[in-house]
Design a protein with these regions (language model features):
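Cytosolic, long alpha-helical scaffolding segments
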Residues: 1-214
Length: 214
């Protein structure tokens, strides 16, 4: 009975890794579309987000099956319940990437200013998602703590983007709408960082039983 349960837990881990990889891919695609000012590339984000949505449903079904058909001990119960929380944040990451892609399509090929900082935010969030899922699979609370600390990098980059764009609006009011679009993109990246942080916090809960909120 336990061996069957362990097999299903291993399947859960694989599914979580695959969903995490899809999140990394969707962030990278949105970032590339932004950097290259490519609306056609941005259109490919939607189908990836749909894959993430489907993966969330698959994992949710697996978790419920584990809870109903097996008798998980406290540690296993925390791991399963943490996975259910984490996939909600991963699904939201896909949604935020699609929000970014929609703005890129609206910009219709206009290149993004401050793309150095926006690219930095994208790379940081990809790294955070990778590490948070790795921390879950490896039950590594130190790695999860690292992810939580890395959110400061994303927050600081967002603050700098906001400062630059406010300066731009002040100097060139005619570019106000464009600047606000870029600010929204930065905000979506900042939210992705928050979701990755949430994932890391649930990793810590799954191992320790304590839900640490940053």
């Amino acid at each position: 009975m336990r061996s069957r349960f362990d097999e299903q837990l291993a399947l859960l881990n694989r599914e979580m890794i695959e969903m995490g990889a899809l999140c990394e891919e969707v962030i990278a695609l949105a970032s590339k579309a932004l950097t290259e000012a490519d609306p056609e590339l941005a259109k490919k984000v939607g189908p990836l987000d749909a894959e993430i949505d489907q993966k969330e449903r698959n994992i949710e079904s697996l978790c419920l099956k584990l809870l109903l058909q097996q008798q998980p001990v406290a540690r296993d119960l925390r791991q399963i319940s943490a996975a259910l929380k984490m996939i909600t944040d991963m699904e939201r990451i896909g949604d935020q990437a699609e929000d970014i892609a929609e703005i890129i399509q609206y910009l219709a090929g206009r290149s993004a200013e401050n793309d150095d900082l926006l690219r930095e935010m994208a790379l940081s969030t990809i790294h955070m998602v990778t590490e948070s899922v790795d921390a879950y699979v490896q039950r590594d609370t130190m790695l999860a703590e690292t992810v939580i600390a890395e959110d400061d990098v994303v927050d600081n980059a967002f603050d700098e983007v906001k400062r630059r764009l406010i300066d731009k609006i002040t100097a060139h009011p005619e570019d106000g709408a464009y600047a606000l679009d870029l600010l929204m993109i930065a905000k979506y990246f900042e939210r992705i960082g928050d979701h990755a942080t949430n994932i890391a916090e649930w990793v810590i809960f799954s191992v320790t039983g304590v839900h640490k909120e940053g």
